[in-house]
Amino acid sequence: MNNLSQIEALLFVSGDEGISVKNMSIITGFDRSAIQGLLEELVLKYDTDLSSALQIRESDDVYRLVTKPELGGTVKQYFDSPVNATLSQAQLETLVIVAYKQPITRVEIDTIRGVQSSGTLQKLALRQLVHEVGRKDEPGRPIMFGTTDEFLDYFGLKSIEELPPLPDFNMLDLGDDIDGELFTSAFDVHQSESEKENV
């Protein structure tokens, strides 16, 4: 395992939220100048490799691994294709958590689900079911996510207020012993009742 591959791995697992130079330094133990040099090397690697679909983007000292703009049409076709019309269980769980807890950060979603959610969030964003709604005022300024109008259309809702209530939801806190199943179970009941009403 070399230094370059460590930085590349961190960019990959951080997903759409990205990772700051400071956090890369904390995790790897490399100093800032070394990380900047490795990032420049990776940027050059992706930019000069015409067969690579990836590139590195930087914003506010946060770096992300993203697909190149010219491949946007191909990526859109993938998410618009019939084979991807149905949400996976992980996508549904993540989406419903965002709906109930928005605005919410990726780390907060991970806390509720108990697993890493960056890849799932990225797919939901590409399907335009969630989007960035701002940044949380805390170290690292993590991205906050919320649902979109496409989310409402997908589930046949007129507004976010039509989401079914969760039991004692206002009493819940991210520190409580809860998981994504709490959210999806309530939503599934609501969907079943709505389908019966439309028969």
Curated annotation (Swiss-Prot):
SUPFAM superfamilies: Winged helix' DNA-binding domain. Keywords: Cell cycle, Cell division, Chromosome partition, Cytoplasm. Its main location: cytoplasm. It is found in: Cytoplasm. The keyword Mitochondrion does not apply. GO terms for biological process: cell division; chromosome separation; DNA replication. It holds the Pfam family SMC_ScpB. GO terms for cellular component: cytoplasm. The keyword Cytoplasm applies. Belongs to the ScpB family. Participates in chromosomal partition during cell division. May act via the formation of a condensin-like complex containing Smc and ScpA that pull DNA away from mid-cell into both cell halves. NCBIfam families: SMC-Scp complex subunit ScpB (TIGR00281). Homodimer. Homodimerization may be required to stabilize the binding of ScpA to the Smc head domains. Component of a cohesin-like complex composed of ScpA, ScpB and the Smc homodimer, in which ScpA and ScpB bind to the head domain of Smc. The presence of the three proteins is required for the association of the complex with DNA. This is Segregation and condensation protein B. It comes from Leuconostoc mesenteroides subsp. mesenteroides (strain ATCC 8293 / DSM 20343 / BCRC 11652 / CCM 1803 / JCM 6124 / NCDO 523 / NBRC 100496 / NCIMB 8023 / NCTC 12954 / NRRL B-1118 / 37Y). The gene is scpB.
